A protein has these predicted regions:
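Short beta-strand element of the alpha/beta-hydrolase
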Residues: 46-55
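Primarily recognizes the serine-hydrolase "nucleophile elbow" in alpha/beta-hydrolase
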Residues: 106-173
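Active-site-adjacent alpha-helix of alpha/beta-hydrolase-fold enzymes
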Residues: 175-194, 222-249
Length: 285
């Protein structure tokens, strides 16, 4: 199936004109960080992919070399793509990052029809910590609810290269006790943006699996099967989601590493690109 998808995409990219409209630094909020770049295909009623970059929620930018080309090829297969920035910690404490993703989704939902898109065909893709954000937005309905949106307004969610819970933390709690870990949690500067151990734990998507989730497809590099434990936590999310009757699956890409998963998305022969498009085509009806 993947080979057929690749052949189709290469043929389409080679025959469809690369005509597209590009909007840069579009504001979806009042903060300077709340900006997105939007690539729009020369088509009508198209689906839109919303991408969130990685960087541990404290760094990263849509213009970084790892992320600047993520959206390039999607308009050539009649998919719009929004590459967004969001407020970063520790200057902006959690949950500013998740709130910004939800705000970006709301902006696209409200405005994409004016560009020819279908607001009912929205998909999320995130890399690394951005994958945590999209998985959370696709499972914890409180973020979208602030914009009068529901999880059913998302056609699909694709987390790429992120754990779904902190396994090291869970092991530490089991070994040393919750009280001891909680007392030391905020002494780590990286943890202070969360405000408490409870808020940190709650930001992991595994704690929000329930019935009524949009379809999930986890995209995993071969090197991520053990360290970090991306495969382990993604499989557990898939299993839990299926128990509630949701559609969820994962795909491991041979020969890929954490960053090569995202750096080659703009190449029409890229198998990760092909799987993303295939998933979107399946669910954009």
């Amino acid at each position: 199936m993947l080979k057929a998808a690749l052949v189709f995409l290469v043929a389409l990219v080679c025959t469809v004109a690369a005509s597209q409209e590009i909007k840069t630094d579009v504001g979806y909020g009042s903060d300077a960080a709340q900006r997105l770049d939007l690539r729009i295909p020369a088509a009508k009623n198209f689906a839109t992919l919303i991408f969130a970059h990685g960087g541990s929620l404290t760094s990263g930018d849509k213009a970084d070399s790892d992320y600047t080309h993520v959206c390039d090829s999607f308009p050539q297969v009649e998919i719009a793509c929004a590459n967004l920035n969001y407020r970063l910690g520790p200057q902006h404490p959690w949950p500013a990052q998740a709130e910004d993703l939800a705000s970006a989704v709301a902006w696209v939902h409200t405005n994409i029809a004016s560009y020819g898109g279908d607001p009912k065909k929205l998909f999320l893709l995130g890399h690394s910590s951005g994958a945590t954000l999209v998985a959370l937005a696709g499972s914890d309905d409180t973020y979208l609810a602030k914009h009068r949106l529901k999880l059913s307004d998302l056609r699909g969610v694709m987390p790429m290269g992120s754990i779904m819970w902190d396994d090291d933390l869970e092991q530490a709690i089991a070994q040393h006790g919750r009280e001891a870990i909680a007392q030391n949690f905020l002494r780590d500067p990286d943890n202070r943006m969360y405000g408490s151990l409870e808020k940190y734990e709650d930001h992991w998507p595994i704690h929000h699996v329930h019935a009524g989730l949009p379809p999930f497809l986890f995209l995993i590099a071969e090197s991520e099967q053990e360290q970090p434990s991306v495969l382990k936590t993604n499989v557990k999310f898939v299993q839990d989601a299926r128990k509630f009757g949701n559609e969820a699956d994962y795909k491991v890409f041979a020969g890929r590493k954490h960053y090569t998963m995202v750096r080659q998305l703009h190449l029409p022969r890229d198998p990760v690109f092909a799987i993303i498009v295939e998933f979107m085509r399946k669910h954009d009806l």
